[in-house]
């Protein structure tokens, strides 16, 4: 009996270690599929998934779009009201993941441990956002776009305007309709 329980525990642990959570960010410009790195950013992925499960992102906008840098969303409504968020999470920027083109990372204030719901997708390799860069602590990467970079690039091309206190606000609202969490598949199954 003990042997069976041990074997079952190993199977469950091994199976979950191979699972790769994936989400689809449905926007008014199209869909963006993101593979989340639960192994390297467990707290950040759990935080993002909880917001997604609670439908928090539905109706929020990409409120900050800077061509040649990044697109940011997940915290403001179309009228630029900030949605009430949960408590901030610890910054997992020292996880080895880099702010490279197509990666998703947590937005935050100057306090390294202030990230809540807002995230950004890198349009280029942003080395200054990695630990040791311009902001010594860095911005926590927790996944990468696997499909829909054309949508990300299209969002980056939308004209922006100043709407104090915000700058770089898309003149045309780019709304996140929902964030769909896909059933998890093992990394091995994805390779086939």
Predicted regions and their residues:
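Cyclophilin-like peptidyl-prolyl cis-trans isomerases
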Residues: 11, 17-192
């Amino acid at each position: 009996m003990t042997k069976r329980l041990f074997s079952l525990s190993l199977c469950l642990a091994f199976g979950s270690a191979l699972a790769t959570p994936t989400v689809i960010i449905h926007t008014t410009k199209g869909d963006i599929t993101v593979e989340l790195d639960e192994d390297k950013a467990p707290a950040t992925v759990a935080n993002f998934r909880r917001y997604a499960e609670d439908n928090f992102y539905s109706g929020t906008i990409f409120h900050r779009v800077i061509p040649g840098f990044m697109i940011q969303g997940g915290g403001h409504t179309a009228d630029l009201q900030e949605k009430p968020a949960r408590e901030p999470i610890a910054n997992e920027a020292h996880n080895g993941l880099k702010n490279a083109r197509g990666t998703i990372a947590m937005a935050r204030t100057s306090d390294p441990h202030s990230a809540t719901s807002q995230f950004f997708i890198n349009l280029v390799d942003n080395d200054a956002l990695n630990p040791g860069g311009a902001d010594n602590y860095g911005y926590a990467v927790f996944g990468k776009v696997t499909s829909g970079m054309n949508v990300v690039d299209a969002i980056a091309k939308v004209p922006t305007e100043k709407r104090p206190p915000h700058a770089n606000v898309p003149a045309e609202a780019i709304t996140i309709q929902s964030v769909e969490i896909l059933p998890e598949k093992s990394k091995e199954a994805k390779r086939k």
